[in-house]
């Protein structure tokens, strides 16, 4: 949900060859989830049916790595570079993988957070940096330690 929201706010599409799972706390830390093996195996099966192209993969919580017990078929595909498993510990890492754009700084329009700030300024009708949405986003950004 969070990555979809960030994508919509920034007007930055999410790659469709990657699946993502995990929970995120209020500071952007990615938390472990259950059923990870089944989620990976399920997405792998879908990708296999459509044809593995070396781009497909799953973004998972880093803290779940030790619980992975995957089929030999998935392990072989990962070893051969046909399927990928990307462990992440923070939402900023996931954003870069999923959108090909660094999360970055709200002051840099070439980053996801900069694009979001710019979009919120536009929605607020404020070309400046003192608009309501921009101010709220800056405060939220600094509160969660992303600044």
Stretch-by-stretch model annotation:
Residues 1-147:
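Peripheral, non-AAA+ core regions of ATP-driven protein-machinery
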């Amino acid at each position: 949900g969070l990555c979809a929201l960030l994508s919509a706010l920034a007007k930055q599409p999410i790659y469709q060859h990657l699946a993502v799972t995990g929970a995120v706390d209020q500071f952007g830390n990615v938390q472990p989830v259950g059923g990870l093996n089944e989620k990976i195996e399920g997405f792998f099966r879908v990708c296999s049916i459509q044809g593995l192209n070396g781009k497909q993969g799953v973004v998972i919580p880093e803290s779940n790595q030790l619980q992975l017990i995957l089929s030999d078929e998935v392990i072989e595909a990962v070893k051969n570079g046909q399927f990928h498993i990307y462990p992440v510990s923070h939402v900023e890492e996931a954003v870069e993988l999923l959108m090909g754009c660094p999360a970055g700084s709200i002051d840099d329009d070439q980053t996801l957070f900069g694009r979001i700030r710019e979009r919120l300024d536009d929605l607020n009708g404020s070309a400046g940096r003192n608009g309501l949405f921009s101010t709220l986003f800056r405060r939220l950004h600094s509160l969660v330690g992303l600044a």
